[in-house]
Curated annotation (Swiss-Prot):
Phylogenetic classification of the source organism: Eukaryota, Metazoa, Ecdysozoa, Arthropoda, Hexapoda
Swiss-Prot/TrEMBL site (Regulates catalysis and binding of the amine substrate) positions: P30
Name the record gives this protein: Arylalkylamine N-acetyltransferase-like 2
Family of the protein in this entry: Belongs to the acetyltransferase family. AANAT subfamily.
Recorded GO MF terms: acyl-CoA N-acyltransferase activity; acyltransferase activity; aralkylamine N-acetyltransferase activity; N-acetyltransferase activity
Organism encoding this protein: Drosophila melanogaster
Catalytic reaction equation(s): a 2-arylethylamine + acetyl-CoA = an N-acetyl-2-arylethylamine + CoA + H(+); serotonin + acetyl-CoA = N-acetylserotonin + CoA + H(+); serotonin + butanoyl-CoA = N-butanoylserotonin + CoA + H(+); serotonin + hexadecanoyl-CoA = N-hexadecanoyl-serotonin + CoA + H(+)
């Protein structure tokens, strides 16, 4: 029986969560490993860190802990239809200065196109924004347990749908194994700049992103 337990994330976890994600998410996520002309473009912006902090007070984010040590993280928050259009417009209008800007622009586009609200006929959803697991305990079902706990939390809080956008094949495989439906998949190669150059040159097999969801 695993000693790893799952509990609600608190604002007191914030600093440790950010340190954890720096190692176990941003240095592992295939999209973040795409080489950039300037290595500084791969750094995580303060705006991204502030987004993480802003989600915690919603009491929808979780941590997996082994004793006192965080070994897994889910950042999640409520999503409403207006968010899709607002985030898309913000991403379209924002000057791209780093790799995360490029990623956010692509993902905002696919989420707007998938439109899980229209797909399911609902007005709110629990959005699983980020899933990270300690690299030393991969394949011990910690990620699966975190997603299962997020789905159960969504059910308890009265959300009609839980959704996420999988940026790599590992997360897509994990979530579809939990009966999450794949609403839309788009290849990164379809995202090109004004010169026709591919913006996100992702490596196999992580060459597409997928919006997944489950009705509760």
């Amino acid at each position: 029986m695993s000693a790893i337990t799952i509990r609600a994330m608190t604002i007191g976890d914030y600093e440790e969560v950010e340190a954890f994600l720096a190692v176990h998410f941003f240095k592992q996520e295939p999209l973040m490993l795409i080489p950039q002309e300037d290595p500084k473009q791969s750094e995580v912006s303060s705006a991204e860190a502030e987004l993480h902090r802003s989600l915690i007070p919603q009491d929808l984010s979780l941590v997996a802990v082994d004793g006192e040590r965080i070994v897994g993280v889910v950042l999640a928050g409520e999503l409403v239809p207006e968010d899709l259009e607002r985030e898309y417009q913000e991403a379209e209008q924002k000057e791209i200065t780093c790799l995360l800007d490029k990623i956010h622009k692509f993902l905002a586009g696919i989420e707007r196109q998938a439109n899980i609200f229209k797909h399911y006929g609902v007005e709110r959803a629990l959005y699983l924004y980020m899933l990270g697991v300690d690299v030393s305990i991969r394949r011990q079902r910690v990620g699966t347990r975190l997603v299962e706990a997020t789905i159960e939390l969504g059910r308890q809080r009265g959300f009609p749908v839980v959704t996420s956008t999988c940026s790599n094949q590992n997360s897509k495989r994990l979530m579809t194994a939990l009966n999450m439906e794949c609403i839309l998949t788009k290849d990164y190669a379809d995202y090109k700049d004004e010169h026709g150059e591919i913006v996100l040159r992702a490596s196999e097999p992580h060459t597409s992103a997928s919006v997944v969801a489950i009705r509760l």
